[in-house]
């Protein structure tokens, strides 16, 4: 990027040490809805989160899969409008990426199909 003077400046990168998933779970008081998925060797190395609303519609270009995936009311409500076959395709595609975990907010409960597929792919859900 150029400054007003015309000189190039270096982009600043935020460097974050990886944080163990178990520490995040304890600090945030998260309930593990996939207890068969081990958190032992799992860590988060990106300080941001992602709400995968576009991905749930099938758009995965520029997907920030390394981030913790947050399912809020908008994403949850959208999933309620989708038929079972399409939901299965959405979950399969979302979980095909190496996402660190999925967190459901506002006491929203994931569907059994998602929990089953997350267990198969070893992706923790909270």
Listing of model-derived features with the role each one plays in the protein:
Residues 1-15:
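Short, Lys/Arg-enriched N-terminal segments with co-localized hydrophobic residues
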Residues 100-106, 123-126:
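Short hydrophobic alpha-helical runs that function as membrane-insertion/retention elements
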């Amino acid at each position: 990027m150029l400054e007003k003077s015309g000189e190039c400046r270096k982009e600043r990168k935020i460097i974050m040490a990886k944080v163990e998933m178990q520490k995040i779970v304890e600090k945030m008081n998260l309930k593990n809805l996939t207890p068969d998925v081990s958190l032992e060797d799992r860590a988060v190395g990106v300080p941001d989160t992602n709400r995968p609303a576009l991905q749930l519609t099938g758009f995965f270009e520029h997907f920030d899969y390394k981030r913790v995936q947050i399912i809020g009311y908008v994403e949850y409500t959208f999933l309620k409008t989708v038929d079972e076959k399409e939901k299965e395709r959405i979950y399969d595609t979302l979980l095909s990426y190496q996402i660190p975990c999925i967190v459901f907010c506002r006491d929203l409960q994931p569907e059994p199909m998602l929990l089953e597929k997350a267990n198969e792919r070893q992706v923790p859900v909270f």
